[in-house]
Amino acid sequence: MPFAVADSLSQRGIAPVLFALRGACDPDRVERFRHHWISVGQLGRATKLFRSEGCRDLIFIGTLLRPALSEIRLDWGTIRVLGRVWAAFRGGDDHLLSGIGRILEQDGFRMVGIRDVAPDMLMPEGNIARATPDPAAIADIAKGREVLGALGPFDIGQAVVVIDGHVVAVEDIEGTDGLLARVARLREAGRIRAKSGRGVLVKAPKSSQDLRFDLPTVGVKTIEGVAGAGLAGIAVIAGHTIAADSQAMIEAADRAGLFIQGLPA
């Protein structure tokens, strides 16, 4: 995802600078862009690099895996704001990202989101694949949105699977791919009796979420997971969801006979 955003910026004549986390980014792909490597705990080094590159606008992109405290090597810039960093780490993922973002904003930077810098990567409203949801799927979508709305304040997950009005799985730390794999296993074990081709994956940002950070994302792998789970399609919030490689995703959905629905916010 960081590289797709960087490509989008480059195509519009904006030269991005990547600050890549060691152990999290693909070195070969990072090499395509102007970049610097930083480690978790090097907030001071990162801040100096941002200023040396003349970067005022910053965006967090990608999955942030929480390291064990023993793996973090703090520099002086991090130690200086250790209380605020620790407070951010104690919360959920949304709290962590927004907490670090607030620290950077207090240092004079501006945190932006994909909606600000690469709106072309967001899901449009309406159905974008050939297949369309039937009345049962529409009801499942409504149920999924209701469930996610209720769960949002608890920072549990951004996705739920609903089949014939029944909530069969909610996303947790495993992520959406793991959620879909779990549904596939439940179906294989006979725990899901509904026939294949019914049910919906619904994704939405949490109600308490800062939309500059960690927007829900769908792509080809999501479509493959939905097909493997025996569902009918996916529904996400238009303008609040990243559609990674949207054309390839649509083609994959059409091959599998799945719908992709962008819901009004």
Residue ranges and their predicted role:
Residues 2-4, 24-25, 100-112, 116-128, ...:
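Catalytic domains of riboflavin
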Residues 43-118:
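N-terminal glycine-rich phosphate/adenylate-binding segment common to multiple enzyme folds
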Residues 1-21:
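N-terminal basic/disordered segments at the start of proteins
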Residues 18-19, 58-61, 111-116, 161-162, ...:
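General beta-strand structural signal in soluble alpha/beta enzymes
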Residues 1-2, 9, 94, 110, ...:
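Conserved mixed alpha/beta catalytic, RNA-binding, or beta-rich assembly cores of soluble enzyme
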Residues 3-10, 47, 100-101, 223, ...:
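Short amphipathic alpha-helical segments and helix-helix/interface helices
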